[in-house]
């Protein structure tokens, strides 16, 4: 068995990062807004930093729980979420703003919902 308190703490950190992503990306209407100005590039940088933190935390959760936590939630592409962190961290100059924007608009909300379900299931 794993340390439930530690897992809940990490889940809450991920939840906070996802909330920041939603807050910082909800007014973006297309990927060009992330590259067309210095402000957009700063927003892209900030979003990528949050995705790195989320991906790293997901990797830690997977290790701590021996894969059992994510196995109970197959509706999320956990491997893809963790892998996106690797792309951002190791191939930063190859980041595709279109991909970041697509993830913000299509993947963040389902991930957030899954994280909330996990928090509830663990009794927080």
What is the predicted function of each stretch?
Residues 1-124:
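Solvent-exposed interaction patches of small proteins and small membrane subunits
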